[in-house]
């Protein structure tokens, strides 16, 4: 189909882009000579951990299996170069005073500026992703975050995420420069919408309680939204909006 051909063309472009990054850009960005094979391994490991809170130590362990002699400072140097090239772009944690600071996770969520780079780095195809819905879910999250950043940039939009050690999470918190913010979950399939909506309502309730107790200066979230891979937009009776990813630009 036309859509499949367009996806394959995008992936071909992304693969060529990765070759350029590994063979030249990663060294020319700051004049430090870097190993193309190591760069490729780092990109692949980062892509495998996309949309997760994987620690750098885990990525180093993963890369070390095939890159003998790579150290933590070397990995940092490569990752800094990839950030400067706008290839990888991590997401910071949102740490509001609604739970004890020790309960809220504060590590960075691993991300790419464009999900097609992650797909190409792992050597995956659209057909493979249709079979591996778990990986597709992580890629879908990266795609939705990219779109949210683009469409909210005129409003000073910034994104973070919320995740605590009790496993309550919002995949994305979108903050606008006027103080408004939205709690967002990303769910590929319709069966997961309920779980996503409950997470958002629970976080909203925590914010409400913290306001009542006078322990936060936060306002309540202005929007609760589950972004899906479906085609129908609607508002649930509890106020959570279900929005297909294709409707975001509207």
Question: Can you say where each PLM-predicted feature lies in the sequence?
Answer:
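Active-site ExK catalytic segment of metal-dependent nucleases
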Residues: 181-192, 199
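Switch/connector loops and helix/strand junctions flanking conserved nucleotide-binding motifs
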Residues: 120, 193-194, 233-237
